[in-house]
From Swiss-Prot:
SUPFAM superfamilies: Ribosomal protein S8. GO terms for cellular component: ribonucleoprotein complex; ribosome. This is Small ribosomal subunit protein uS8. Belongs to the universal ribosomal protein uS8 family. It holds the Pfam family Ribosomal_S8.
């Protein structure tokens, strides 16, 4: 049984980009879908769509590469894990990699980037970082 769908999804994206695959197939959850919407909005993935196979849902992610064939994602790292949760208050959320990276935070107002959480004045659980 799989306990952490976010870590599994990030690992599948990381492995697919290292193998230079066009797509990655993830298990569906609302948090994974919200995380992917942020990654798509920030330009780290081309697009994603939810597909149903029988009674199960999956997310098909189209990965993005630069003109030299390198993945746009340099590092995709899970911060808060089931064994060690990491929370940051609204004043503690800082820029990541001098503004070149993105922090994805799960707040009481939904999953959003660190910049959006700071502007909204909310803190929360730091799900992952990407740059």
């Amino acid at each position: 049984m799989l306990n952490d769908l976010i870590s599994d999804g990030l690992t599948r994206i990381r492995n697919a980009s290292m193998r230079r695959l066009e797509t990655a197939k993830l298990l569906h959850s609302k948090v994974v879908e919200a995380t992917l919407s942020i990654l798509a909005a920030k330009g780290y993935v081309e697009s994603y769509n939810v597909i149903e196979e029988g009674n199960k849902k999956f997310i098909n992610v189209v990965l993005k590469y630069d003109e030299y064939g390198r993945s746009v994602i340099n590092e995709l790292k899970r911060v808060s894990k089931p064994g060690r949760r990491v929370y940051q208050g609204k004043d503690d959320i800082k820029r990541f990699k001098n503004g070149y990276g993105t922090v994805i935070v799960s707040t009481s107002k939904g999953v959003m980037s660190g910049i959006e959480a700071s502007k909204a004045g909310v803190g929360g659980e730091v799900l992952c970082t990407v740059w």
